[in-house]
């Protein structure tokens, strides 16, 4: 662990390099000296793979080589005082060339219209959208060792690249720590007399680390997609659907706490930050274990992290018989200092409504935006009274269509779901050919498999929901 901590000292280098601030040069050079060239290169591979997940291995490698060369040259004794600034400027200029060997970003052309420090700042601010569908598949033990023995450095670089582009939303401390631990395992097991036994033992040791990295990548991806306010809304909806027998006072602090943790930790390099997750799991049990039998079962897991994972994947519970929920249209919705009226409405609607969170977050964002516009109009009361019926109709229509798109999915196996879906579509389109029907079943079931579960990826599903709802209307 001490080695990992030292490894993380160089994180500041990337920020300094991208910002082009000379005052950080001394710190960069000290970090490089304490880290050594090999580990500095490894860290750069993780950082830039994470920053440019659509880049190829060759593109990331080119960039890493340039970064390492720049650092070593400009930190050498007797180096030109302008070396650092000149080389970082040249690096950003090279990124703008049409035949640049570096990874590209959709925002790169805009950055390239700027000059000097402004260009570097623009490049540094570029971020890719989260990878919502990781594709990394771990090779077999034999394949791992064959590649490792052939070229240990190439194996390490490719693993760090593959793992980082797939799980790059995990906090940097976890991502770096896990990749280093994994490579240490490979180095030990591929040179041991019995690799199979070694891998079995070492993977067991790494299980918690691996789970934590993968889980934080998932929740931080959702946070990156939603932002702080929508993330709070999303978690409130999920808790209301998972534990509909709870009260708002039970779940609202949990939704706010997890949002705060993610806002602090997803981009943090502090090791202490992620320790808040196990503490949060304990609070989950304190608030909800007596409200729901499935939650109570989750709280029987051995470790806080296992409790958190269990709660995360827990499906929505059957909703109890509840009265209809009316969209609040009085002046209380405009009280920015008191969100309880809207929070109560969101909670009541969510625990009564059987459609996935991505659907509710999508329509509620639009509804809340319309309410906010009324609150900032000349006559908020008149605006609310005028828009209220229309918003209620739109909300009801959207929920109905969402229920149609996801009908039968959560209650059945995928095979049974497809059978029921085919029956429903056959009844809805009696004149459709068998080929057309099969294509429609395949398309709709693929949509359901990605967007009809409790933790569906928001970026992907946001546009897909619109497309599928349009097919219902056509």
UniProtKB/Swiss-Prot annotation:
One Gene Ontology biological process: vitamin D metabolic process
What broad class describes the main subcellular location of this protein?
secreted
Q: Which UniProt keywords apply?
A: Actin-binding, Disulfide bond, Glycoprotein, Repeat, Secreted, Signal, Transport, Vitamin D
Task: Give Gene Ontology CC terms.
Answer: cytoplasm; extracellular space
The record lists its disulfide bonds as 29-75, 74-83, 96-112, 111-122, 145-190, 189-198, 220-266, 265-273, 285-299, 298-310, 334-375, 374-383, 406-452, 451-461
Write the gene name.
Answer: GC
A Pfam family annotated for this UniProt entry: Serum_albumin
Query: What does this chain do?
Result: Involved in vitamin D transport and storage, scavenging of extracellular G-actin, enhancement of the chemotactic activity of C5 alpha for neutrophils in inflammation and macrophage activation.
**Under what name is this protein listed?**
Vitamin D-binding protein
Q: List the carbohydrate attachment sites.
A: 86, 287
Q: Does the keyword Secreted apply?
A: yes
């Amino acid at each position: 662990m001490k080695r990992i901590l030292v490894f993380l000292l160089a994180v500041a280098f990337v920020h300094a390099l991208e910002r082009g601030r000379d005052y950080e040069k001394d710190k960069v050079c000290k970090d490089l000296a304490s880290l050594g060239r090999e580990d500095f290169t490894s860290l750069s591979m993780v950082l830039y793979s994470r920053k440019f997940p659509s880049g190829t291995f060759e593109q990331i490698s080119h960039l890493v080589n340039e970064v390492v060369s720049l650092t070593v040259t400009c930190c050498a004794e007797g180096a030109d005082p302008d070396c650092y600034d000149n080389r970082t400027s040249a690096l950003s200029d090279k990124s703008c060339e049409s035949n640049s060997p570096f990874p590209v970003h959709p925002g790169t052309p805009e950055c390239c219209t700027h000059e000097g420090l402004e260009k570097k700042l623009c490049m540094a601010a570029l971020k890719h959208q989260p990878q919502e569908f990781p594709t990394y598949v771990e090779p077999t033990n034999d394949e791992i060792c064959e590649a490792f023995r052939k070229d240990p450095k190439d194996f390490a670089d490719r693993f760090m690249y593959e793992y980082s582009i797939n799980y790059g939303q995990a906090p940097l401390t976890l991502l770096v720590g896990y990749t280093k631990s994994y490579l240490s395992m490979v180095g030990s097991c591929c040179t041991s007399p019995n690799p199979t036994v070694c891998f079995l033992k070492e993977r067991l040791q790494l299980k918690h680390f691996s789970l934590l990295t993968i889980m934080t990548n998932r929740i931080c991806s959702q946070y990156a997609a939603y932002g702080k306010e929508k993330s709070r809304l999303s978690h409130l909806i999920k808790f209301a659907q998972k534990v509909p027998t709870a009260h708002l006072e039970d779940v609202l602090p949990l939704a706010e706490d997890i949002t705060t943790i993610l806002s602090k930790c997803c981009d943090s390099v502090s090791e202490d930050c992620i320790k808040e997750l196990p503490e949060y799991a304990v609070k989950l049990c304190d608030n909800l274990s007596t409200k729901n039998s499935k939650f109570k079962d989750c709280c029987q897991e051995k470790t806080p992290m296992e409790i958190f994972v269990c709660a995360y994947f827990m499906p929505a519970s059957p909703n109890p018989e509840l009265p209809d929920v009316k969209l609040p249209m009085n002046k209380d919705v405009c009280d920015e200092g008191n969100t309880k009226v809207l929070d109560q409405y969101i909670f009541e609607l969510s625990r009564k409504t059987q459609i996935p969170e991505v659907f509710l977050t999508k329509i509620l964002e639009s509804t809340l935006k319309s309410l906010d516009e009324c609150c900032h109009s000349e006559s908020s009361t008149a605006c609310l009274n005028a828009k209220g019926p229309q918003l209620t109709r739109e909300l009801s229509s959207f929920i109905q269509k969402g229920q149609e798109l996801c009908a039968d999915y959560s209650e059945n196996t995928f095979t049974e779901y497809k059978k029921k879906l085919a029956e429903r579509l056959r009844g809805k389109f009696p004149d459709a050919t068998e080929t057309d029907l099969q294509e429609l079943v395949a398309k709709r079931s693929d949509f359901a498999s990605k967007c009809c579960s409790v933790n569906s990826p928001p970026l992907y599903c946001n546009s897909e929901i619109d497309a599928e709802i349009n097919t219902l209307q056509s």
